[in-house]
Amino acid sequence: MDKIVIEGGKPLRGEVKISGAKNAALPIMASALLTEGWNTFHNIPDLMDIRTTRKLLQSLGVVIEGTSGTIRLNAGEISNIEASYDLVKTMRASILVLGPLVARLGIARVSLPGGCAIGARPVNLHIKALQEMGAEVILKEGYVEARAKRLKGANLYFDMPTVGGTENIMMAAALADGVTLLKNAAREPEIVNLAEVLNGMGAKVSGAGTDVIRVEGVERLHPVEADIIPDRIEAGTYMIAAGVTGGDIRVLGCCLSHLDALIEKLIDAGMTIEPFDGGLRAAGTGTIRSVDITTLPHPGFPTDLQAQMMSMMAVAEGLSVMTETVFENRFMHVGELMRMGADIQIQGNSAIVKGVGALKGAPVMATDLRASASLVLAGLAARGTTELSRVYHLDRGYEELEKKFSALGAEIRRISE
């Protein structure tokens, strides 16, 4: 098993190119199931979750050319309607094949998903919506089985904004009979990207990016060529890296409008953020001010940047309160940060972070994707050597992480244990 070794304490400087967004690429790859013929998608990142999705779609009969960058998918002949546990167990986004399969073929059998162990993330919202669209859905032996001759348009309300649920039902509704309204829909940029792809296929989706999405079902969709948006979470991670190391990084290829909540907090913390054509400059000033964070669905502060921001607050001046409202059990990185000298107390769904000025390198263990990123940032800021184990979590969501940080001047390397 690999681990990452970091010699910290060096300001990071230079340029970093942001990869395509994993959380946009996964549903867009699944959307190919709605069509016959060759879909072409650009800016696909080379990540473990992408490779898992590739295997999953191929197991269903999808022909795929390419592994990253530009890939082509042809779902003209679906030979299997079951997404098996062996493929689904490592990645929750696997549930995204459920809606497209039921919509196009009238049947699907998908194993209950796995992925990061950061809370329940229930699929009941997906199931309830499909049932309201006329599908017969049962849970049997760890699988979701859904059947419908043709899904019917429906007036749907999500009890809470759900990114995966919004995406799944948007895709299902694209081939349904009639109009579907998704109320209290998630508003993330990745949902807007998916809606653009669906409309390119001939779907009639409006309102993506708001909390009410309207989908008028059509009889048939056609293949499309489309681009994946840049990864706002990767961009945010490198922006925070500039702050936590007192560095100066030009973040290329990011979309500023996707980063509003983070930018505001980084400026409050004393960083310099300067937009330019094609990206932004993020620079630390040497002194980090404490800021309070409350995670919220988009356009609020993203839960996927909470752990990284905590690493920065661990070396800030003063006291910060970080409140997690989106997922439960998302403070599993706290114990590892404390091994490096951080002063953090958990009170319910809040973490009270008292800045200590400097962290010390230590052996630490990743518990999930974003927690692992926070430990990398802490290691980059710390004095001495940090060894991060279980780095397969990082490989699920960060493309060429060591290479990109090395290009910014970090002493970081991967070794096999």
Swiss-Prot record:
Keyword Cell cycle on entry: yes
Protein localization: Cytoplasm
Domain of life of the organism encoding this protein: Bacteria
InterPro entries: Enolpyruvate_Tfrase_dom (IPR001986), Enolpyruvate_Tfrase_sf (IPR036968), MurA_subfamily (IPR050068), RNA3'P_cycl/enolpyr_Trfase_a/b (IPR013792), UDP_GlcNAc_COvinyl_MurA (IPR005750)
One of the record's GO cellular component terms: cytoplasm
Catalytic activity: phosphoenolpyruvate + UDP-N-acetyl-alpha-D-glucosamine = UDP-N-acetyl-3-O-(1-carboxyvinyl)-alpha-D-glucosamine + phosphate
The UniProt record lists the keyword Ribonucleoprotein: no
Active-site residues, Swiss-Prot/TrEMBL: 116
Documented EC number(s): 2.5.1.7
Protein name, per record: UDP-N-acetylglucosamine 1-carboxyvinyltransferase
Record organism: Syntrophus aciditrophicus (strain SB)
Gene: murA
